[in-house]
Amino acid sequence: MIADLPLFTVQERDALVVLAYLHLEQSRPGEAAVLLRPLHRALPDDGEVERCLAVAELSSGRVESAAKLAAHAYTLAPSHVRTAMGLIYARALWLSGDEPGAREVLLKVLAQKATSE
């Protein structure tokens, strides 16, 4: 059945993520977000896509979208990227005007970092 077919193959997903990273490296977050939004809709549990999209949205000034994406990505992030994702989440909250929320996330990140060392 056609509805059961994936929207993106693994190779297409990987190619779009690499292209998005290249756009981010070239300071073109809007272009990265354009590539990542449909990918995120198709693969909402793909942490790498969500993290990359959060960075693209934050860099594009879409702080509310970035905060929402980063909040979800932070909870699912593997330990080796959790601190970085927490900082992105806190920055998005700060820029959206939620300073108490940003402080709370920063304190949580610092506490987790301290217990892991």
Predicted regions and their residues:
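Alpha-helical segment of the N-proximal tetratricopeptide repeat
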Residues: 10-34
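Start-of-helix register in tetratricopeptide repeats
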Residues: 14, 48, 81-84
